[in-house]
């Protein structure tokens, strides 16, 4: 029987959310990692949040009215990047469902004129790595999700460099210029959202920004001119947003510093890209998106 692919609608939210939760639970239990979606309620809430986001677009695949999987694609204007995820397929789904969803998402990304497409892959799920590789994605950066408590409270070894909130258009402009030097483009929308949420902060020395964070957490990103600046951003965050934050596994200095300050590695992940990619030459923290 043929598969149907169509946009996700509001009355699909609960079924898609439950499938996402079941899929993550099956993979995590098979490999001994904590589940990235701790409950069905979390999975349903995630789908509802993404469906309500005007910068996200979701599709599902079904057979005779039974939903088998879903996928989302996101844009972050003015960034040229489109992001894919989460891709979830029901554990009982047959082979080829994920490929159909990926193909449909990539077609949509190209229709929106995105030539840079990115995702964060869970390496515990080898099948997804194979799928993304066959779709043309390249592994760019192995990541660790670091979990722990804010270093701003209690006895710790946080950096003594000071930070202050990102406040005005001049601050935003300087942060965007630093971001461009790292990524090749700004992440202006995400930075402004973090400002609205009161979690964006920066380091400024001699009139120049040497680092900023759009929050410290799994949905946040940060860039810095040095590891000492990055330590200051992490160390001065009043809270860790979500289950933790991603750190490039190749940044031994930051990983070792975090471990020495009581953090633990939650699970590994991989940043993968399709299309043009500028490798960051300065320290950075990616988000769950990229």
Residue map of PLM features:
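A short beta-loop-alpha structural element at the N-terminal edge
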Residues: 4-18, 140, 161-174
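Intrinsically disordered, low-complexity, positively biased terminal segments
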Residues: 9-10, 52, 56-58, 62-63, ...
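Active-site rim helix/loop that mediates acceptor-substrate recognition in acyltransferases
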Residues: 17-58, 63-72, 180-200
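Glycine-rich phosphate-binding loop
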Residues: 96, 100
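Conserved catalytic-core motifs of GNAT/GCN5-like acyltransferases
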Residues: 118-122, 138-152, 265-277
């Amino acid at each position: 029987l043929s598969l149907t692919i169509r946009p996700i609608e509001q009355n699909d939210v609960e079924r898609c959310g439950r499938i996402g939760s079941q899929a993550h639970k099956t993979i995590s239990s098979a490999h001994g990692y904590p589940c990235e979606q701790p409950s069905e309620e979390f999975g349903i809430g995630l789908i509802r949040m993404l469906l309500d986001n005007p910068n996200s677009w979701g599709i599902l695949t079904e057979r005779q009215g039974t939903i088998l999987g879903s996928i989302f694609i996101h844009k972050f204007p003015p960034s040229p990047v489109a992001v894919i995820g989460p891709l979830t397929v029901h554990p009982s789904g047959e082979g080829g469902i994920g490929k159909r969803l990926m193909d449909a998402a990539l077609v949509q990304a190209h229709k929106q004129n995105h030539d840079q497409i990115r995702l964060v892959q869970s390496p515990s799920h080898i099948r997804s790595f194979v799928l993304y590789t066959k779709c043309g994605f390249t592994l760019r950066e192995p990541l660790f999700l670091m979990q722990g408590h804010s270093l701003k409270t209690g006895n710790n070894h946080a950096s003594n460099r000071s930070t202050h909130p990102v406040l005005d258009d001049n601050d935003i402009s300087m942060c965007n210029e630093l971001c461009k030097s790292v990524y090749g483009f700004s992440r202006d929308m995400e930075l402004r959202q973090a400002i609205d949420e009161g979690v964006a902060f920066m380091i400024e020395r001699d009139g120049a920004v040497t680092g900023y964070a759009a929050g410290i957490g799994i949905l946040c990103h940060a860039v810095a001119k040095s590891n000492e600046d990055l330590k200051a951003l992490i160390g001065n965050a009043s809270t860790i947003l979500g289950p933790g934050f991603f750190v490039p596994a190749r940044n031994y200095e930051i990983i070792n510093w975090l471990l020495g300050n009581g953090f633990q590695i939650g699970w590994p992940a991989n940043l993968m890209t399709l299309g043009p990619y500028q490798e960051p030459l300065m320290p950075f923290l990616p988000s769950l998106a990229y």
